[in-house]
């Protein structure tokens, strides 16, 4: 049943994805705003490591054109020293003779400062030194590198840079793990792209004061939470049934509870999370949701519980009745089978009795005095006794005369063994089959001879 073919009498609210804030494409992923990708972190930036300050208190030495501010006495001493240095340079006097001796063991930051101060004095002391600096512009950078190497922070910086270039296989593993965790978060929220586009037609049945057993319908996508759908449904109830402002607090989201299929719904749940089966593609699924005031929530749940118990009891009674019906059917089938078997046995007994009666009639005709079989000869003919040996190795004795045919002997054996009338009986004497048309005299049988009987 689709939403177009269903006639709806209740007021309906269509939350169109193009006209409401619910369908904003930018709001699809609510939990991914603060996410980040580990791959976006750039570990190859060398500028950060190069801009590390080794010693914040070390001052950069002044340039060649910087001036020193001296007092008057120091200025006169400096001029005299400059003149003496210029004279000594003309006489090829070594500049090291006028250089002040350095302290033996400068400590800490004083060491760097003293070196820098002396370098400044040497630069300003002689023009020849200035020429040397021009010829060797890298001498100052060497002095700076020597000053920087004195600080222990420089060693720590080199160790840090070496650690950044160390490759670890676990880095790739953790990157892949973070990607999988990001994917699983997205999948748990919305399992498939088709499920995000699935449409539901929700019928909100009100149990609130003023709209009891009244309903509104809202058509939404399955990805939206009930916390976003419920305000529109409550507003639709108030507008459709003209609820006064005095009762407005009853229709607030925080004052109501939702129930579906005798179960409580939480506001963060979605229609897709209910896992309602879909009969065909693009089907608009119908959902009936009951709105109950939190004030009567316990009473409603108690009513639901009693209703469930009644349904369970009715289900148990129905199952018991179904089981009894099956047992009764099985019992009837068994009785019918037994009755049929009894009828079959009774029929066989009747047939056997009928055969016996027929055999008795024939036996009466065939048997004569002493159980002997008579032929066409007179009663004065000599009677002899022969044995009929069956396949069960049991003997039946019969009295015959010399004129008794073998056909009558075979018929007598069939009657005594209660065999069917159509049974074929063969007689053998000295391993030769006897002709049923012959008689005892034809085989020269004597008293107490034995004849073998074979049943086909």
Curated annotation (Swiss-Prot):
Q: Per the record, where are the segments of Polar residues compositional bias?
A: 1-24, 83-93
> What is the first-listed, main subcellular location in coarse terms?
cytoplasm
Coiled-coil parts of chain = 301-360
Task: Tell me one GO molecular function of this protein.
Answer: SUMO ligase regulator activity
Please provide, in alphabetical order, the Gene Ontology terms of the cellular component aspect for this entry.
Cul8-RING ubiquitin ligase complex; cytoplasm; nucleus
Pfam family of the protein (one): Rad60-SLD
- SUMO-like region-type repeats, residues: 169-287, 380-456
Task: Spell out the residue ranges making up region: Disordered.
Answer: 1-154
What biological-process terms (Gene Ontology) are attached? double-strand break repair via homologous recombination; heterochromatin formation; mitotic intra-S DNA damage checkpoint signaling; mitotic sister chromatid cohesion; positive regulation of protein sumoylation; silent mating-type cassette heterochromatin formation
Q: Which UniProt keywords apply?
A: Coiled coil, Cytoplasm, Nucleus, Phosphoprotein, Repeat, Repressor, Transcription, Transcription regulation
Task: Report the subcellular localization.
Answer: Cytoplasm; Nucleus
Answer yes or no on keyword Nucleotide-binding.
no
Top-level taxon: Eukaryota
Phosphoserine found at: 90, 125-126
Q: What is known of its domains?
A: The 2 SUMO-like regions, although related to ubiquitin domains lack the conserved acceptor Gly residue in position 456.
On subunit structure and binding partners, the annotation says:
Component of a cullin-RING ligase (CRL)-like complex composed of at least the cullin RTT101, a linker protein MMS1, and the potential substrate receptor ESC2. Interacts with RTT101 and MMS1. Interacts with SIR2.
Purpose of the protein: May be a substrate targeting component of a cullin-RING-based E3 ubiquitin-protein ligase complex RTT101(MMS1-ESC2). Involved in HMR and telomere silencing via the recruitment or stabilizing of the SIR (silent information regulators) complex.
Q: What else is known?
A: Present with 1890 molecules/cell in log phase SD medium.
- UniProt-recorded name of the protein: Protein ESC2
Native species of this protein? Answer: Saccharomyces cerevisiae (strain ATCC 204508 / S288c) (Baker's yeast)
The gene that this protein is the product of is ESC2
